């Protein structure tokens, strides 16, 4: 089924974001592992796998709409140097993804591509209710209990 150009443009934009988020989570997870913060490593590695799954869903949809996904393009990533900075960069990225998903869903509605919209709604729910929410909680914990206590709680 041939997709509408406006919808495909949005799907490609989202794919670039998911690939970048995956890579940002990848480097951050390995940094946490290197620092001995095993709980953070495990959670952020899980987030990386979720972003890979989101990218896979977008790739499958783009292919269904008879276009070839471009995996050579992705948005820039921001690598933090401290745990709070890394968590904040990841949260900022999730907020950007949320805004892009909502924009893309509006385009899907306008173009009457309800299947793409429904797919994006599932990704949005995961992004808002899991990824962004968890990151907000971690930054809140750092404020409440202090960075040193937080870091100690993230060791295995």
Curated annotation (Swiss-Prot):
Q: Which Pfam families match?
A: Ferritin
Q: Where does Fe cation 2 bind?
A: 51, 94, 128, 131
Give the molecular function GO annotations.
Answer: ferric iron binding; ferroxidase activity; heme binding; iron ion binding
Q: Where in the cell is it found?
A: Cytoplasm
Where does the Ferritin-like diiron domain start and stop, copy by copy? 1-146
Listed under catalytic activity are: 4 Fe(2+) + O2 + 4 H(+) = 4 Fe(3+) + 2 H2O; Fe(2+)(in) = Fe(2+)(out)
The highest taxon in the source lineage is Bacteria
Instruction: Supply the alphabetized keyword list.
Output: Cytoplasm, Ion transport, Iron, Iron storage, Iron transport, Oxidoreductase, Transport
| Example GO biological process | iron ion transport
Q: Do you know which InterPro entries this protein is assigned to?
A: Bacterioferritin, Ferritin-like, Ferritin-like_diiron, Ferritin-like_SF, Ferritin_DPS_dom
Give the disruption phenotype, in one or two sentences. No visible growth phenotype in iron-sufficient conditions (30 uM Fe(NO(3)3)), in low iron conditions (no more than 36 nM) cells grow at half the rate of wild-type. A double bfrA-bfrB deletion grows as well as the single gene deletions. Even in iron-sufficient media both single and double gene deletions have lower photosystem I content (PSI, which contains 12 Fe atoms), store about 50% wild-type levels of iron, and undergo iron-stress.
Q: What is its EC number?
A: 1.16.3.1
Q: Which GO terms describe its cellular component?
A: cytosol
**Entry-linked PROSITE patterns:** BACTERIOFERRITIN, FERRITIN_LIKE
Q: Which SUPFAM superfamilies match?
A: Ferritin-like (SSF47240)
Where does this protein chiefly localize?
A: cytoplasm
Provide the family line: Belongs to the bacterioferritin family.
Q: How does this polypeptide assemble, per the annotation?
A: The bacterioferritin (BFR) complex is formed of 24 subunits (BfrA and BfrB) of unknown stoichiometry. The BFR is arranged as 12 dimers that are packed together to form an approximately spherical molecule with a central cavity, in which large amounts of iron can be deposited.
Stored PANTHER family: BACTERIOFERRITIN
Main function: Part of the iron-storage bacterioferritin (BFR) complex which stores about 50% of intracellular iron. Iron-storage protein, whose ferroxidase center binds Fe(2+), oxidizes it using dioxygen to Fe(3+), and participates in the subsequent Fe(3+) oxide mineral core formation within the central cavity of the BFR protein shell. BFR rapidly binds iron in labeling experiments in vivo during iron-limiting conditions.
| Name the record gives this protein | Bacterial ferritin
Q: What is the lineage of its organism?
A: Bacteria, Bacillati, Cyanobacteriota, Cyanophyceae, Synechococcales
